[in-house]
């Protein structure tokens, strides 16, 4: 699924603004990107999540979240989230359920496992795992590249809301650079065709679609 943001800046415009030391654009862009996708679990580390899932499975009423439908959120508080009313308490419980469910799904569906990806003469993972992790989002002032905060080396970036709704393996990335766009187009074309396509054929296909 590809989402276009109306009025969005081009990758070059974003790069120029990010590298402007006099602008607060960089800070706002980082805040936005960190709010919509992440490369880590919500409730803790991989070890924490595994422990939580193992404990949850001991409950006779536990259900594998990849085999269930999502629970919709309760009605919002009409008093600007007072924190004391029934709606606020129900939403707090729902949010806790949301966080644990998302982490459970990620643990089951999104963790990369080295099965079949090492069958090459270099003995390296074809999917380039483990990925580099970043304790904080970093901005490379030499080229404007953004390395988004990422705590788990065996996870791609995800959007919690999408994971909660789809309830299976989903990856989410931001196409804010020419490099990212080329990488995703190449990945999708290879995934569909199962054989490498020439670059000009890839972009011709994109042109014909739009």
Each PLM stretch: what is its role?
Residues 2-210:
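Intrinsic low-complexity, intrinsically disordered terminal tails and linker regions enriched
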């Amino acid at each position: 699924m590809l989402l276009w943001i109306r009025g969005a800046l081009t990758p070059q415009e974003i790069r120029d603004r990010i590298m402007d030391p006099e602008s607060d654009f960089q800070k706002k862009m980082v805040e936005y990107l960190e709010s919509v996708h992440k490369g880590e679990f919500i409730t803790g580390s991989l070890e924490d999540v595994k422990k939580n899932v193992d404990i949850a499975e001991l409950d006779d009423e536990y259900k594998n979240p990849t085999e269930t439908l999502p629970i919709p959120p309760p009605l919002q508080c009409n008093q600007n989230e007072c924190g004391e009313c029934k709606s606020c308490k129900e939403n707090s419980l729902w949010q806790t359920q949301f966080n644990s469910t998302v982490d459970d799904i990620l643990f089951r569906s999104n963790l990369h496992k080295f099965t079949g990806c090492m069958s090459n003469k270099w003995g390296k993972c074809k999917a380039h795992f483990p990925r580099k992790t970043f304790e904080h989002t970093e901005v490379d002032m030499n080229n404007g590249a953004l390395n988004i905060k990422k705590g788990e080396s065996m996870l791609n970036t995800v959007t919690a809301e999408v994971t909660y709704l789809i309830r299976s393996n989903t990856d989410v990335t931001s196409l804010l650079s020419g490099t990212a766009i080329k990488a995703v187009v190449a990945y999708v074309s290879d995934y569909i065709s199962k054989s490498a396509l020439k670059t000009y054929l890839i972009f011709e296909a994109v042109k014909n679609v739009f």
